[in-house]
Amino acid sequence: MALAKESSIVVSSSPDVTHNITRPVASYHPNVWGDRFLLSSSDQVQLTMKARDDKVVVDELKKEVRRKLKEASNDYIRLLQTVDVIQRLGLAYHFEEEIDQALRYLFETFHDYSEDSQDMYANSLSFRLLRQHGYRISCEIFEKFKDANGGFKIPNIEGVMGMLEFYEATHLRVRGEDILDHGFVFSRNYLKSVLPSLSNPLAAQVDRALNQNSNRRGLPRLEARHFMSVYEQYASHDQALLKLAKLNFNILQSLHKVELSEISRWWKGVDIARNFPYARDRIVELYFWVLGVYFEPQYAVGRKITTKVIAIASLLDDTFDAYGTFEELRIFAEAVERWSVSCLDQLPEYMKLLYKTMLEVSDEIEEEMTKLGTPFRIAYGIEAIKTFARSYFLEAKWREEKYKPTTEEYMGLATKTCGYKSLIITSFLAMGDIPKREHFDWVLSDPDFVMASCIICRLADDIVGHEFEQTRDHIPSSVECYTQEHKTSKEDAVNELYDRLESAWKDLNEGFLRPTKIPAALLYRVLNYCRIIEVMYSRGDWYTHVGPEMQGFVRQLLVDPVPE
């Protein structure tokens, strides 16, 4: 979308005095969904009742799957494959205890199995599953698959599944694992070369891994839906597992539709088109974002709170980035620090509703935390909202001063303005009794794990979105900073930033490995924030520009049920 310099009559630093102010307004396209996600009361009741009926069948199928897990408990390969399929179908949260027990067994017996095994598929799958769950498995197990020239042995066509699993396993690598760095390049090139000769369902799996996302980086709900369509094509598929996956997916979709309807009604009350016409109207995409962070039914309150907070963050971003004058932003930033309804009279008219909405959402956080019996979390939630405005104002200062930061200076601020630290804290708020005070303080201490997520968010956004941003008055992105600092081409800058992004993924993988003092449930929130970035910013800024592919993802999760 092209940008336009628009002359707007707005309130300046005093709400009683208006001036003609020329503003650089980004011409964002309107909401593509209209009111389609606003459900009537009868629609909500119908969805809820069907989900309740289906849950009876689901509970019976879960018993059957537990029996199958028990039957496979002493068969290494069978157990390995059963756990993998359960996870790929999006069912792992139903069988956490059983999967933990299975993985302990696989870890304890892995060395003996791997020592005698030349099966690349089983070794790679073992490595991936165990590393995903924090077990420190050495990458040296792949040395036996190297050839005399230091490359990897090329399998016959029947061995493609082994190479695919090896490719998936390389996405769990950490810094210093050269064999997996080489293995990633080799397996990717090999799979690309054989893809045209493959037939479904294997071709669909290889294509997905190469052109969408790996198992590690894909969005669990999207990957589960895709895997169902692949899995049912294999003659060996387990009918009970497949039926359970489809029913479970649709039950969750019904729950999510009801949640999105309630959030959409709240957003309609804010009335973005009338009150904030300069901003991106993207509540559906924001709920999709948060759904990527956690989809399980027990986190419904968390999704509601986090969606509202990220919606406020988006409004703040557009206000600071593409509308407010520096003086208006200064006044607003000061009001945020004071955090009081008494500040409303000092704000420009168009900022009053935004400030009031921020206070209302913070009141809602306070109410929910009081219900949960965790009042200490209230301050963390409010501080998370304040941090958005604080960091956006620092960016506005750079823009006002025409400051040209170095790449490292830019990243120091940009890892704050990406908002991921605040969003991670927000997503912890309503996670029951899992997060303790020390876990919130851990996020605020900038550990490598959290900073890796901020780097992934910022660089992925910059790489695909910097050209659009630079068409208006905007601070340079990491691409421009690196290009100017190192006197290099944009292509070289982007390649360097991709390398940094990959290094951040390695740090993220390292943070999962045991021992760790942070509960896995919290670590997965951070990982899932990175996964949603991989989906929404891999080939463009699909939050700002909601094209057919992004709309298709939304439909898969929030419109079309899986055919049963």
Swiss-Prot record:
Sequence positions that bind Mg(2+) 2: D317, D321
GO BP terms, alphabetized: alpha-copaene biosynthetic process; cadinene biosynthetic process; diterpenoid biosynthetic process; farnesyl diphosphate catabolic process
Key words of the record: Lyase, Magnesium, Metal-binding
Primary enzyme class: lyase
UniProt similarity note: Belongs to the terpene synthase family.
Note on cofactor: Binds 3 Mg(2+) ions per subunit.
Cofactors: Mg(2+)
Domain notes: The Asp-Asp-Xaa-Xaa-Asp/Glu (DDXXD/E) motif is important for the catalytic activity, presumably through binding to Mg(2+).
The reaction(s) this protein catalyses: (2E,6E)-farnesyl diphosphate = alpha-copaene + diphosphate; (2E,6E)-farnesyl diphosphate = delta-cadinene + diphosphate
GO MF, one annotated term: magnesium ion binding
Pathway recorded for this protein: Secondary metabolite biosynthesis; terpenoid biosynthesis
Protein's job: Sesquiterpene synthase converting farnesyl diphosphate to alpha copaene and delta-cadinene as the major products.
Pfam families attached to this UniProt entry: Terpene_synth (PF01397), Terpene_synth_C (PF03936)
Source organism per UniProt: Phyla dulcis (Aztec sweet herb)
EC number: 4.2.3.133, 4.2.3.-
InterPro entries reported in the protein's UniProt record: Isoprenoid_synthase_dom_sf, Terpene_cyclase-like_1_C, Terpene_cyclase_plant_C1, Terpene_synth_N, Terpene_synth_N_sf, Terpene_synthase-like, Terpene_synthase_metal-bd, Terpenoid_cyclase/PrenylTrfase
Name of the molecule in the record: Bifunctional sesquiterpene synthase 1
Superkingdom field: Eukaryota
Coiled coil segments of this chain: none
